Design a protein with these regions (language model features):
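Short, Lys/Arg-enriched N-terminal segments with co-localized hydrophobic residues
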Residues: 12-24
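Sequence context surrounding c-type heme c attachment/ligation sites in exported
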Residues: 43-101, 105-108, 112-214
Length: 214
């Protein structure tokens, strides 16, 4: 049986003293000490803990994290052209850049939460807000469960786009940020078209024109 860490340490100390007294045994004791260090380390490792609970639903995370962060970025990383000229709404101060970065970081990490095992689409009893064009939570859940790998790939597409947007923010490269936020928008719309409103023909045609889907 493996000894615990404290016993292993005591034996290692005795091995060190024995090595001083008999240098010819140094290699032997070094091997023993190494094995005991490994054993001691292993004995301190407890069993894996329980999985974390997933109380929030995908809808909860979309409402609390993804939608507000994406909308903030789309509304504040923009140049508006009207009859008066160009209105630049991009960040200018350090505080504005920090807020933009905070929102982008939400989009980087949200996909990790969305794909967590056991995460449900919505709370029991939730209904589609516009059932004439939207799928219900049960239908969306079935689409995800039937091909979970595809759901993970779509979430990763959002994450990858958000990571590049975050890099542009850190570089304060506005042109690159405009471009990468376009990719974020496409990733969002692609996922929505597949799971949320796949039967909305007008949205799908618009998405094809914008290069969101083939």
């Amino acid at each position: 049986m493996w000894c615990d860490g404290a016993k292993a340490l005591a034996i290692i100390r005795r091995a060190e003293r024995a090595t001083w007294e008999n240098p010819d045994m140094s290699t032997y004791w070094a091997m023993i000490a190494t094995l005991l260090c490994v054993a001691g380390g292993c004995s301190r490792q407890g069993p894996p803990g329980p999985e974390l609970a997933t109380s929030a639903t995908i809808k909860d995370l979309m409402d609390a994290m993804v939608d507000p962060s994406a909308e903030y970025l789309f509304e504040n990383i923009v140049e508006i052209v009207d009859e008066k000229g160009i209105i630049d709404k991009t960040p200018k101060t350090d505080d504005e850049w920090k807020e933009v970065r905070r929102r982008a970081l939400m989009l980087v990490e949200a996909p990790n939460l969305l794909v967590a095992p056991g995460r449900k689409v919505a709370q029991p009893g939730d209904k589609a807000e516009y059932p004439e064009v939207e799928l219900g939570p049960e239908q969306i859940q079935k689409l995800i469960d039937d091909d979970r790998d595809a759901f993970v790939r779509r979430a990763r597409r959002l994450q990858d786009a958000a990571v590049l947007a975050l890099k542009a923010i850190d570089a304060r490269d506005k042109a690159e940020l405009f471009s990468k936020l376009g990719d974020v928008d496409k990733a969002c719309e692609s996922c929505h078209l597949h799971y949320w409103y796949p039967n909305d023909t007008r949205a799908r045609e618009a998405a094809k024109e914008d290069g969101v889907v083939d």
